[in-house]
A protein has these predicted regions:
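Structural signal for conserved beta-strand scaffold positions within catalytic alpha/beta enzyme cores
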Residues: 34, 56, 84-86
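Acidic-basic catalytic patches of nuclease active cores, encompassing PD-(D/E)XK
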Residues: 1-35
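Short acidic/glycine-enriched loop/turn segments that link adjacent beta-strands
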Residues: 38-41, 91
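Short, surface-exposed beta-edge/turn micro-motifs
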Residues: 41-42, 51-52, 80-83
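Active-site-adjacent loop/helix micro-motif of nuclease/hydrolase catalytic cores
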Residues: 60-71
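Alpha-helix C-cap/termination motif
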Residues: 28, 47, 77-78
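Domain-level recognition of nuclease-like catalytic cores that cleave nucleotide substrates
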Residues: 12, 72, 76-124
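Conserved catalytic cores of phosphodiester-cleaving nucleases, focusing on short active-site segments
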Residues: 25, 44-61
C-alpha cells in the first residue's frame, strides 16, 4: 500500500534551495552560515578571505522592493556583496544587486555574477 505524499510546502522548497546554494558555496571554498527564520534580510552569509556575500535565495528570482532594499542596505553598511540566488530547472544562477529597487515590477537592478569573478578579484 502506497501512502499518498503531501505536497511540499513553500517553506520546505525554499529551505531546500537554501541548502543547495549553501552546499554549492561551500564547494567553492566559502564558509557559509544559514540564518534560519522566515523573512530575514539575508538567507546565507558566505565568507572567504576578503569577501563577504549576503545571499537571498528565491525560487522565482524575484524580490519585492522592501526585501531587495533591505538586503542592499545591509550589504552596503558592512561592505558585503548583495547576491540573489535564483533556482533554475537545473542548477541555479547568481545575481549581484547593483542598486536599490524603486518600485514593484521594475526591472531589477542586477547583473549576473559568477563566483569565479569574485575569486579573480574582478571589481564587484
Amino acid at each position: 500500500v502506497t501512502t499518498p505524499t503531501k505536497p511540499r510546502s513553500a517553506y520546505h522548497r525554499g529551505r531546500d534551495l537554501e541548502h543547495r546554494v549553501r552546499t554549492h558555496l561551500r564547494e567553492e571554498g566559502y564558509e557559509v552560515l544559514r540564518t534560519a527564520g522566515s523573512k530575514s534580510k539575508v538567507d546565507l552569509v558566505a565568507i572567504k578571505p576578503g569577501q563577504i556575500l549576503f545571499v537571498q535565495c528565491k525560487r522565482s528570482g524575484a524580490l519585492p522592493p522592501a526585501e531587495w532594499n533591505a538586503l542592499w542596505d545591509l550589504a552596503q553598511m558592512v561592505g558585503a556583496v548583495p547576491v540573489l540566488a535564483e533556482q533554475l530547472t537545473r542548477g541555479r544562477r547568481y545575481w549581484r544587486l547593483t542598486a536599490r529597487k524603486d518600485r514593484p515590477g521594475a526591472r531589477q537592478p542586477y547583473v549576473e555574477l559568477t563566483l569565479d569573478e569574485l575569486a579573480a578579484g574582478v571589481a564587484v
